[in-house]
Amino acid sequence: MKKHALILSLILGLSIIPAGISYSTDADAGKAITEIGILVNAQKYQIAMTKCNAAIQKYPNESFLYYWRGSIHNSMGEKQAAIEDFNKSIELDPANEKAYVLRGICKADLEDKEGALEDYNKAIELAPEDGSAYSMRAMVKLDLGDMDGANSDLDTSNKLMNSK
């Protein structure tokens, strides 16, 4: 599960940067978010963490700064710290489906399968066309013994990912 979670974390991170989306109305904050995302995708976690902490001091209401810091914590195996940052990201932007998916990954890694399932359900509610949440939810359903639900989610995920 952890190997798949790392791969999905990288995919989710990469999906933000190429589109040039910063998710910020402040140009300087947007630039910081983009730079941090690039560092995370390059697996330069310590440098990214330093920049992220500095940016949070300057822009404490930027949801995606907490998202990226949570991603860094997750990549470094610091699941509880990651969950706290994803909680803050969601508090600031309840429509950020990527934060729900990554928080769900952390919860699943900490054996909170029901909490993970709730997060994946919310991510799917927010972005039903995103196959990654279906894939992760399938893994949790499999762990919970719901083979039919897991197969259904994998089918949906494959259809969505193949249609892009």
Regions found by a protein language model. Name each.
Residues 2-164:
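Alpha-helical tetratricopeptide repeat
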